[in-house]
Amino acid sequence: VTEAADLGPQRAEGRFGIATTFAFIIVAVSLVAPASPGAQLVSTVGLILLPGLLLTSLIVPWGITGLRKLLLATGIGITLFCFVGAAAGAIGPYLGVSRPLSRVPLLVVWLVLLAMLAAVAVVRRADPVGDLLAGHPRRSLWWIAALAVPPCIALVGATELNATSSNTIATAATVLGLGLVFASVAFSRRIGEGLQAGFVGSAVVTLVWQIPTRGGWLWGWDIQHEFSVAAATIAAGRFPIPHSHDPYAGMLSLTVLPAQLHFLNAIQLRTILVLVPGVLLAACAVTTLLTIRRILGPTGSALLVALLIVGTTSFLTELPALMRQCVALFLFTVVIQLVSDPTAPIRRVRVLAAVLGLGLAVSHYSTAYMSAAAVVVAWLFGLVLRAHWSRRVLTAPVAASFAGAALIWGLVVA
């Protein structure tokens, strides 16, 4: 079980980016293929994960491996996905494209970008996909498939509850979710890091998806505002939304992100607002687990995350209704994981931290302000301790990038 769960492959020398290039081809094919659940899943995951994984591997070729690298790549990929869409939406009208955030223009942009990234992988002999998969036994895939079952049961249970008022399957899904949380603590010393993280991630998705999928309407006190802004972006097919003075319209997590998922992957807006927050919250919990595991060990970290999941009302009942905050919280947890990793090359980590700061700034204003304040305080604390700058990730330029991005985007651009 431990071998199946550990996600720390060694980098293979002499590769020519074969696995990564093949993965880019699969994503490109899924983009142009007729809409189906399989194609939607592959294209959605691939558009965010593959570019982020390649860029992360090029910037930090060593020091960060396995699941930590996968989470970091997801954060970088979300940031890139948002900024590419924003650039396309803003520049397109000046090139004569009236609706640049519609399917055909976005397909052209992303197919060209995917081809360029695949070429970079070949030229630089970078194969992050191959590195990630190297040395993993087949039973790892079985664990991944098994842990995907409880979230699916949660969706089936919600559907049955909506249609027949029977809560049998929904109750079973809840029991499974709580059981996974318990297993992550009870068996923390007998399973590997990856499997423990898998238990936590599957549990969060299973429990969170139980709430917004029930009933025939979107759920949440602020969901009307989020939905209207996202729908206006999709209707306009461009960014910024013409003649809009709504501050929410400046958040790429509510405008460009759902618009691209809708047009590129044929995913309905309601589906995006219902399912994506649960996945992001699961990623937050997993990232938190891996970050504090270095300090508290497998049992202490699992217990603390379990308390976060089942002991915090807002985590399961309030945050799933705030997609913009879920995006920002995930990026912030990745920043904390990144700056607290003692194995990562410090200078290159500073670059990735600054990039994630940009992603925070365009995702959620309040989280961006608080994150910037936390980074500035941490930088000042490092000065008080007189730690040499070469040993500090949060230097003055990094702190300035967080604060500057939050202030400029929140107060000027938006």
Regions found by a protein language model. Name each.
Residues L338, S371-F402:
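Perimembrane helix-loop-helix junctions
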